[in-house]
Amino acid sequence: MSDQEFGLDAIRNIGIMAHIDAGKTTTTERILFYAGRTHKIGEVHEGGATMDWMEQEQERGITITSAATTVFWLGAKINIIDTPGHVDFTIEVERSLRVLDGAVAVFDAVSGVEPQSETVWRQANKYGVPRIAFVNKMDRMGANYFGAIESMREKLGANAIPVHCPIGSESQFVGMVDLISQKTLYFLEETLGAKWEEREIPEDLQEQCATLRMQLLEELATVDESNEAFMEKVLENPDSITEEEIHTVMRKGVIEGKINPVLCGSAFKNKGVQQLLDVIVKWLPSPLDRGNVRGINLKTGEEVSLKPSKDGPLAALAFKIMTDPYVGRITFIRIYSGTLKKGSAILNSTKDKKERISRLLEMHANERTDRDEFTVGDIGACVGLKFSVTGDTLCDENQEIVLERIEAPEPVIDMAIEPKSKGDREKLAQALSALSEEDPTFRVSTNEETGQTIISGMGELHLDILRDRMIREFRVEANVGKPQVSYKETITKTSNSETKYVKQSGGRGQYAHVCLEIEPNEPGKGNEVVSKIVGGVIPKEYIPAVIKGVEEGLNSGVLAGYGLVDVKVSIVFGSYHEVDSSEMAFKICGSMAVKEACRKALPVILEPIMKVTVITPEDHLGDVIGDLNRRRGKILGQESSRNMAQVSAEVPLSEMFGYMTSLRSLTSGRATSTMEPAFFAKVPQKIQEEIVKK
């Protein structure tokens, strides 16, 4: 099917998101199978899943990068992004959600809402992404559809409404009652679930289904209060409401984020996946439903609103970079307005650099098809972009628009890295540069005192997998040091500095004079450097050099050399010499000035605090809490169900190395835990002194 056959209202850009092991990739595999994209079902546990195409993913059985693919169903074109569920790969989820119009949240019928489900849900709230939910693994021991829905309401604050009533559960799960059509679907094993029989509702479920349907209709009546005819029917004659009417109101409720309908099934056992595909098309929004995209016009500084139209000016967002051994650098983009043609020259407005598109590719996991153009609503990949990275805006050369960026969280863990042989030094530098372009949460820096190269990321698994990729994709063997905490420094009060950099050594000298004011910025806002120079006391051609010097000075703090964060710097005054001043002199002076100001601004060291969730048998609860307290943990809450307790706490990362091993020995291997970065906080004075001594 060519794209020309699809209007914007028939496009669905969706993500599949969940906690690790909820069965997200298996669900996507079934979608590909039923929509005719694959002829054999790939199994994750056999390492044959189409979407998990990186070698490490097939070995580890987890999804690391967001694979993109396109399928066709009920006359609609569905672009699907399968996102990772492990906390170390949060940026993959974040950048997918930024470019999606809707999402399917997959939950495990036994566990319900798990810690990573909460993280992903919060990220989707941030971007206002409409969601439907699929309670998967209904065939597992202990599966509880209504329990999972209850946990969605309690933990996520979701307006979770069942649209199915399961028939049987665990090994007896055979199908479900569709509360909208009031039909019972029994799946036929011999057709791999591709066919089912429709029957009447079993007698023992009739009363429960009637109650659930009434609750569903009453909830829908509150979605659109202007639809008085629907409300009247719900109150006076609910049996007269047609399926069509229900779907219309449901779609409105989902798109406005007022309702999260919940389906059930077992992707592994091929039950319920086509029903999920049906409602993706019926209820999730098209690019038109998501409305205009907002950006900033760089020439005027004003906010602009772009209609999703293929005839409008080009506005696209780069949301992922990938390096391919055969094709080179691939940039994934989402087009919000206009059309992008192969061979066209465009502007990266974020960087103010011109780019040229050499090829356009439609992706199916790691297979690709060449395309001549992409138009509004498409998600695709381009080859030939040299400067564009995650979060950059691409637009027409005469239409300078910048879209909202993708925020990357600060890394929390550092490791020293060096090539195994001196000859690999150049290759290692290239590999690190390529990987940090692909992944904004992976940073590379140099320790100024030791000269060591330091890599920083979101967790041990994150850095471990990147090291694997260096060996496999870039053929670089590297030694890595022990993981260390990625501390930061910041300031706690306002201060200023006046710095002169003067050098006379025969011939032309060096002269620069810079006055700065610095103050603490809001936590999480990052560093800001602004020039308040008036009257040309520092000529405007030297201002960028001062700013660059200040930024470089902030890269290493004054207490223990850790990068400074959340500092606002204003360049307020200075002077220059007609002959001796130069860009280099002002850059050096800017760096010296910011260091001097920081020393006077009561600097402190910050450490990453992790949100830790432990699920333990109740008889070990006291030991687990005692152990978290000893690790400087702050217990946030605990809850119990079925002899198991869940404890959530905030604990400094520096206290969490080797935690899994000690948790296993505390609980005889019966407890599990997850942790994710929460925020940075000031370290206690005594620990700060120890860090500075090191």
Curated annotation (Swiss-Prot):
Domain (tr-type G): residue spans on this chain: 9-288
Places the protein is found: Cytoplasm
GTP-binding among keywords: yes
GO annotations of cellular component type: cytoplasm
Keyword DNA damage among record annotations: no
InterPro entries: EFG_II (IPR041095), EFG_III (IPR009022), EFG_III/V (IPR035647), EFG_IV (IPR047872), EFG_V (IPR035649), EFG_V-like (IPR000640), EFTu-like_2 (IPR004161), G_TR_CS (IPR031157)
Keywords: Cytoplasm, Elongation factor, GTP-binding, Nucleotide-binding, Protein biosynthesis
Binding site for GTP: 18-25, 82-86, 136-139
SUPFAM superfamilies registered for this protein in UniProt: EF-G C-terminal domain-like (SSF54980), P-loop containing nucleoside triphosphate hydrolases (SSF52540), Ribosomal protein S5 domain 2-like (SSF54211), Translation proteins (SSF50447)
Family affiliation: Belongs to the TRAFAC class translation factor GTPase superfamily. Classic translation factor GTPase family. EF-G/EF-2 subfamily.
Stated name of the protein: Elongation factor G
Native organism taxonomy: Bacteria, Pseudomonadati, Chlamydiota, Chlamydiia, Chlamydiales
